[in-house]
């Protein structure tokens, strides 16, 4: 393991910040890519989510930011709003050593006018989806004249979503003299073609899936298709995870599994492609703040999910692609933490299990299912209040915290994460005081205005 301090160009303040964030040593992708990135070279990297790639390009682009220059100097393109939010959050943490650095996300599904207002003072860094960014470029609300670093994150996913033309159009607005960093989980011909068009003699780095595999205990259970839900309920009763993601291959199974867990008192939410954007946002917020213990999701819907301490991942169905299997289980061992991944295998999935074994070069750890016993509940510690207002009402976490602890009299220990979104604020409060907080906040005020509050269920 190589320490970040070996990178002589990182300033002491950044090294101190990395230490405070718990980043003590570099991941394989960081060790391979950062020297070239910090030297200003173009780099193309094939690596999975969870490999530390955000910090790799984040540390690089931050070294080129002049906070006294109020122009956009770095751009990160992402396939989804969720990934953009995740990347922006990580960049803000990495940028704590650099005061007054403005980072802005520009994604579809958010009011254009609100974004236009935020752009009156140009951000130093923009994290965006290609379509919405192109809208702003064409309307003249964003300028890339001072851009020195362009990053394309999950480039293969952007192509899958049909963003190829939009990416080309965006790049036409960028200066030719820039550093371009391209990250992709896979490397199809279309990605190689984009690299050839937009990069100059890039350093090619490939982090093999087996090299990047974190310290995860994998357990496999042979069961019938009909036996999967009872087995899942028993295993959740046994392990009692504070947070768990269950992966299903279809939206139908995703909802059926979620409903079955809730029926026995195991708090679960579902995340799949049929959800409206608002419902999707609320689901992600509620799971992240502890208002549900289990998230049942499809692979596409879970892209960009950022949960720091995920104790357990369950493959309700084995993925068709072994690379997807690695991507799934890697969510339970972020930043070097260990994790547990459980996979169910019905007889018709045996071939998929063999492919996973061959690819990862491991002997599968087959387990005996626990004996039939009573199902234990899995209750969430927190509940979520949704307050109308958010960024457009200039609400801050401190405003909400003050209302809850001052006017309503909640103990600070009863309040969890406060997430401020454009039109809403989501507040996690302990279940025991949730109804009291909701009822009293209904008639109360935040920043002098009466607020509309809902208790999400």
From Swiss-Prot:
It holds the Pfam family DbpA. One of its GO terms (biological process) is ribosomal large subunit assembly. It is an enzyme of class 3 (hydrolase). Contains an N-terminal domain that binds non-specifically to RNA and a C-terminal domain that binds specifically and tightly to hairpin 92 of 23S rRNA. Residues 230-376 form the Helicase C-terminal domain. GO terms for molecular function: 3'-5' RNA helicase activity; ADP binding; ATP binding; ATP hydrolysis activity; DNA/RNA helicase activity; RNA helicase activity; rRNA binding. The keyword Iron does not apply. It comes from Escherichia coli (strain K12). It catalyses: ATP + H2O = ADP + phosphate + H(+). Keywords: ATP-binding, Cytoplasm, Helicase, Hydrolase, Nucleotide-binding, Ribosome biogenesis, RNA-binding. This is ATP-dependent RNA helicase DbpA. It is found in: Cytoplasm. A motif (Q motif) lies at residues 3-31. Monomer. Its main location: cytoplasm. SUPFAM superfamilies: P-loop containing nucleoside triphosphate hydrolases (SSF52540). GO terms for cellular component: cytosol. ATP binds at residues 47-54. It comes from the Bacteria. Belongs to the DEAD box helicase family. DbpA subfamily. DEAD-box RNA helicase involved in the assembly of the 50S ribosomal subunit. Has an RNA-dependent ATPase activity, which is specific for 23S rRNA, and a 3' to 5' RNA helicase activity that uses the energy of ATP hydrolysis to destabilize and unwind short rRNA duplexes. Requires a single-stranded RNA loading site on the 3' side of the substrate helix. The gene is dbpA. Its EC number is 3.6.4.13. The keyword Cytoplasm applies. Requires hairpin 92 of 23S rRNA for optimal activity. ATPase activity is stimulated by interaction of the N-terminal domain with RNA. A motif (DEAD box) lies at residues 153-156. Residues 34-205 form the Helicase ATP-binding domain.
């Amino acid at each position: 393991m190589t320490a970040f301090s070996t990178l002589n160009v990182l300033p002491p303040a950044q090294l101190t910040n990395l230490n405070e964030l718990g980043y003590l040593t570099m991941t394989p992708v960081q060790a391979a890519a950062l020297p070239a990135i910090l030297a200003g070279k173009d780099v193309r990297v094939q690596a999975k989510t969870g490999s530390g790639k955000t910090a790799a390009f984040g540390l690089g682009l931050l070294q080129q930011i002049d906070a006294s220059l109020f122009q956009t100097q770095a751009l990160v393109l992402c396939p989804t709003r969720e990934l953009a939010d995740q990347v922006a959050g990580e960049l803000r943490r990495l940028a704590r050593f650099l005061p007054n650095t403005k980072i802005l996300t520009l994604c579809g599904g958010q009011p254009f006018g609100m974004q236009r207002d935020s752009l009156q003072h140009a951000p130093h860094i923009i994290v965006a989806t290609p379509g919405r960014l192109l809208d702003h470029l064409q309307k003249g609300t964003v300028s890339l004249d001072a851009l020195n670093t362009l990053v394309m994150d999950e480039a293969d996913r952007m192509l899958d979503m049909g963003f190829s033309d939009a990416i080309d159009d965006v790049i036409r607005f960028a200066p030719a003299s820039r550093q371009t960093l391209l990250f992709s989980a896979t490397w199809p011909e279309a990605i190689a073609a984009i690299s050839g068009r937009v990069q100059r003699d890039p350093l090619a780095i490939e982090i093999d899936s087996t090299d990047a595999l974190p310290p995860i205990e994998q357990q496999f259970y042979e069961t019938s298709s009909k036996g999967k839900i009872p087995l899942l309920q028993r295993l959740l009763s046994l392990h009692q995870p504070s947070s768990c993601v269950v992966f299903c291959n279809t939206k139908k199974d995703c909802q059926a599994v979620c409903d079955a867990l809730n029926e026995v008192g195991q708090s679960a939410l579902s995340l799949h492609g049929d959800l409206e954007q608002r419902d999707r946002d609320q689901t992600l917020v509620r799971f992240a703040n502890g208002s549900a213990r289990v998230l049942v999701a499809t692979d596409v819907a879970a892209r960009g999910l950022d949960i720091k301490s995920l104790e357990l991942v369950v493959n309700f169905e084995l993925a068709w692609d072994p690379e997807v299997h690695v991507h799934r289980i890697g969510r339970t061992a972020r930043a070097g933490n260990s994790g547990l991944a459980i996979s169910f295998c019905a007889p018709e999935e045996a071939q998929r299990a063999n492919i996973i074994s061959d690819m990862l070069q491991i002997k599968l750890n087959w387990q005996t299912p626990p004996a039939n016993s009573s199902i234990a509940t899995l209750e969430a510690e927190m509940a979520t209040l949704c307050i109308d207002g958010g960024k457009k009402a200039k609400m801050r976490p401190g405003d909400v915290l003050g209302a809850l602890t001052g006017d309503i009299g909640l103990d600070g220990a009863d309040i969890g994460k406060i997430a401020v979104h454009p039109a809403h604020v989501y507040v996690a409060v302990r279940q025991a005081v949730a109804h009291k907080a909701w009822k009293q906040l209904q008639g109360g005020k935040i920043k002098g205005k009466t607020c509309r509050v809902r208790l999400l269920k």
